[in-house]
Structure formats: C-alpha cells, structure tokens
Amino acid sequence: NEWKNDRWGILIGGRLDKHNMVDNVIFSPRANLRFNPTQNINLRLSYSSGFRAPQAFDEDMHIENVGGTVAMIERAKDLKEEKSQSFSVSADMYHRFGAFQTNLLIEGFYTRLTDVFVLGKPYDRGDGILVKTRSNGPGAKVMGLTLEGKVAYLSILQIQAGLTLQRSRYDEPHKWHDDAPAEKKIFRTPDTYGYFTATCTPIKPLSIALSGTYTGRMLVQRMDITAENAELGKMPERKAEAIRTPRFFDLGVKLAYDFKLYKTVDLQLNGGVQNIFESYQKDFDRGANRDSGYIYGPSLPRSFFAGVKISY
C-alpha cells in the first residue's frame, strides 16, 4: 500500500512465500519512507526482509577436484532457510551546472543474517570422495556505505562511478577446516569495491567507451594437499589456509564507428581491449592434484576483441 504527495511518500507491503523445502509460509515485510525537502533532493529510509530456501544450488551440482580428490557438497538434514533483515538510508541529489547534469547518491546499509548457510569441514565419506556439508551458522552482519556519482555533458560525455565500503562478519568465528584457524570474516567478500563507466561521442559516428571495476582484498579458501596426493600432480604438499588476495583493477576500452550503408541500414565496426593492465590471478593451482575451486579475481586476462554489427 502506498501513500504519497510532492514531499512525502510512504510504502508498506509484504510478500508471502511457500516453498516445498520449508514447512511454513514465510512472510517478508517491507517498508519505505521518502522525503523531498526540495525538488532535487530525495531522502529515503527503507526496511526489507527476505530468505533463501534450503534448496540445491548450482554449486552443489559442481564436482570439484581438491588435491587430486573429488569433492562434493551435500545439505545437512536439518538445514533451515537463511533469513535477512535489511535497513538502508540514502540521499539522492541532482543539480545542473550550465550544460552539465550531475547526480550524487549516498547510501548506508545494514543487513542482519540469521541461520547463515556455511560449508563445514571436508571429510572422506569412505569411497575416496570428500564431502563438505552445508549447514546453518549462528548469524552474520553486513554493513557499509555506498557512494555513486553521475556527470553528463550534453550528449558528448557521460561518466558514472561508484564505490562501496563494506564490512561483512560472522557472529562467531567459522571453522572451515581442521588445519586452518577459524575466521570471522565472510569469505569472498571484499571490504572495498567499485566501478566506473565513461562514454564519449566526440563526433556523431564515433563513440569511445571506457569501463573499469575495482575489487579490494578478500579472504579465499585454499584447500590442503596431503603427502599422498602431492605425488599425483604438480602441486606440493601444503596445509589448508585462508589466502588474502591482492587488489584488482580491471580496465577496458571499446571504440566503435558507425557507417550509413542505406537509408535505414547502419554498419558498425568496433574493437577494444579487456583487462588492459593484466590485473589477473597469478597463483592458480595446476596439475591433477590442484584445488579447482581456488579461483578469484577478474575472469579474463588481457584480451583483444573486434566486431561487426548491422542494424536496420
């Protein structure tokens, strides 16, 4: 249900879900309060809730190779749904400086997770296959601040950028392996990440697009390799540990030029480079006894591309 006028807006609602893996109907309420002190400033206060059902996920179907041994994921018999309660407050501001249009968004957020899905310590089920069990953890908190800005100059230049500062922690240290210390930080969640895009059209047929993503340091699990499995491939014996990854800045550029072939037919030639600075993982595991899940960072090394597009 929503009530609004020029300065105020109140939205209250909810959602009912019935999942075949959950016994009861789940009600997820939400609310939003908007206030506009001026025409160009939007202030918002929001609350929402949600859940993840204890179903099979894509990664559950993926069979990993860990130190020369097959590893699989199974669900605990008493696995319950993961629930979230989220709060956010934001200020969205617009202003025009002559031919320049600008927008700045500042948002703070806090999410409380209960019955968090966690993967337990791997064990051998007896047939040479390692099993990691997905169960419910005690809980977690995710909080942070997001800044986003946009600048546009006529139809010639558009720039957009965003930066998020985030803290994500379990309520209690999570023991993910016998050989490794427990960790409170949630794995694969960087404390800092951001992006930017810039598009320039100096002349009508030509467009230049520049884009980049920044990923801060994060913790990634690297599984152990036993002395027995070390003989199977290139990776030496090692203990399991949580690796703190380096920072990554993935920058790409694309140039495109349009040709008029006929009244309503255009031909575009384009080309560019992805990951210009070769910001890429340097310590992949290799060989038959590798940990195939030990992958992080940008998905592609430096790559060149070219294309042709016909539109009519």
State what each model feature region is.
Residues N1-W3, L16, F35-N36, S49, ...:
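Residue-level signature of outer-membrane beta-barrel architecture
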Residues K4, V25-F27, K83-F87, G139-M143, ...:
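Residues that define the transmembrane beta-barrel architecture of outer-membrane proteins
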Residues N36, R44, D78-S135, K141, ...:
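Membrane-embedded beta-barrel scaffold of Gram-negative outer-membrane proteins
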Residues N1-T38, N42, A53, E64, ...:
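Signature of Gram-negative outer-membrane beta-barrel scaffolds
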Residues I12-L16, A31, L45-S49, D58, ...:
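Transmembrane beta-barrel strands of outer-membrane/channel proteins
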Residues R7-I10, N40-L43, F97-T102, S155-I159, ...:
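Repeated loop/turn-to-beta-strand initiation elements of outer-membrane beta-barrel proteins
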Residues K4-R7, N103-L104, F109-R112, T133-I225, ...:
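Gram-negative outer-membrane beta-barrel transporters
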Residues T114, Y214-A230, Y257-Y312:
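C-terminal beta-signal and adjacent terminal beta-strands/loops
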